[in-house]
Amino acid sequence: MKEMSLPTTRDSEGYCALYKMDCGDGLGLMTVYQVYPGIQVIYNDFEAAGCEWEENLDRDILEINHCREGREGSRLLSGSCLYLGEGDLSIHTMDNCAPEMSFPLRHYRGISVLINLKMAAEAPPEILSESGIDILKFKEKFCHDGNCFIMRAKDEIEHIFSELYSVPECLQRPYLKLKVQELLLFLCMVDVSKEKQRTQYTSPQVELVKEIHKRLTANLQERPTIEELSKEYLINTATLKDTFKGIYGQPIGAYMKEYRIRQAADLLRQTQVSIAEIASQIGYENQSKFASAFRDIMKIAPAEYRKQSGGK
């Protein structure tokens, strides 16, 4: 992973800055909008395994993340790791999180809202002043004792964020202001005690399961069982299953089925290899079982997929 670079472009007003990221194994784009004094909205688009940036240990900056596509992982200073799935939202202070993001599916699209609490409190959005909301209390509410708050996907979050991904440019500035106000009012109403928190995983657990993932995806013709992996890597089967799903979003079996089929789809588009050979390469000895699995995932037969995608 590579560090965050200087802005590639910045407008004359200081309203928008664009960062093009070389992540070592992929690329990323971060578009930063200064919506209010002390409040930024950042659009994140990554096709990479992760990204790093310069360390920022300001305990008075609150970071709110929303995952639109893919998965996003963060490592807390305690050493614990937590992961967001599609539609999830997280809140933490900048000083409680390592200056990096990981993307287990090598694809991530989401929005971050950064709030400098002191600056925002000095010049708050008008609606906050009118409602008597003290934005400084958000830190104690959501990040008490260094906690990170996670909210699972729900309709209220979807309502606030979904429209932000398709705002016409001519309306973007007033719309971002409106949506930031809506988000802050929504967070004011959240009852933290009623939100079930996501499991956090230790760094050693995460690194071990990532090694297992690497093993599983390196040779698709092999199909080790969970019990075999558990013995080989000295990890409890329940811990392996739970941690794998927490990182990658699916049980091992379902994840590997989809992974195999996605690899097969690439081969169908990019090569002239026969369907039978492709099935064998990704671990299906029976071509009819491969065809059935392919239809389950891609909703189309392999031969028809190759034809429609203009495969070689």
Q: Residue ranges of each PLM-predicted region?
A:
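Polar/acidic, low-complexity leader/linker segments enriched in S/T/G and N/D
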Residues: 1-5
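N-terminal functional module of multi-domain proteins
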Residues: 10-109
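Conserved hydrophobic/aromatic pocket- or pore-lining residues that grip, position, or stack substrates
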Residues: 176, 216, 240
